[in-house]
A protein has these predicted regions:
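Short amphipathic alpha-helical interface segments enriched in basic and hydrophobic/aromatic residues
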Residues: 3, 21, 46, 50, ...
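Hydrophobic alpha-helical segments that drive targeting, anchoring, or assembly
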Residues: 16, 62-69, 81-94, 115
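Hydrophobic alpha-helical connector segments
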Residues: 40, 45-79
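Short amphipathic alpha-helical segments and their helix-coil junctions
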Residues: 50-62, 91-104
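Hydrophobic/aromatic-rich alpha-helical bundle segments in the mid-to-C-terminal region
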Residues: 84, 88-89, 99-158
Length: 158
């Protein structure tokens, strides 16, 4: 039982410690508790996903990406001030860099596109019914986001 199988809210310190083969007081000692542990994990998980870049097609969010979204949402719920610090916006920054490098876009445009893609993924994972998103539509939305980036890249290079 770990974050791969369950949401962060459903795991206890004892369960996390058992999976990590450590004593549960160690988590509190070294990380200050479950929240601190997850704050340490988020950048590591985000970096692993970000190094892969944007896939050419994206049928649906991977299980790994779903876990990242749920962890991010849980962290935001537990500590609303956490993502106010610009250095903690790891996912947004990674997407911005991908858009800058892949499409040669200005940083401000790349940030907006990264935020749009994050909104799509977060909505698809957390609240697909709120916008009537069908699973097969996710790939169409992703393709549209890439097309928008390509068109913006063409317009900024003129």
């Amino acid at each position: 039982m770990c974050i791969r199988d369950r949401s962060p809210a459903d795991l206890t310190l004892r369960q996390i410690a058992q999976h990590a083969k450590c004593h549960h007081p160690d988590i509190a000692t070294y990380f200050g508790g479950k929240l601190g542990l997850y704050k340490e994990l988020l950048p590591i998980i985000a970096e692993v996903i970000a190094t892969r870049g944007l896939p050419p097609t994206f049928a649906k969010p991977s299980a790994e990406l779903v876990r990242l979204v749920r962890l991010t949402a849980w962290l935001d719920e537990q500590d609303p001030s956490y993502f106010r610090n610009a250095s903690e916006r790891i996912i947004r920054d990674a997407l911005t860099n991908i858009y800058v490098q892949r499409f040669n876009l200005p940083i401000d445009v790349a940030q907006l596109l990264g935020q749009r893609l994050m909104a799509l993924v977060f909505t698809a994972v957390l609240h697909p019914g709120s916008i009537g998103l069908q699973e097969q539509q996710f790939s169409e939305h992703f393709a549209l986001e890439i097309k928008i980036a390509q068109l913006l890249a063409r317009n900024t290079s003129i």
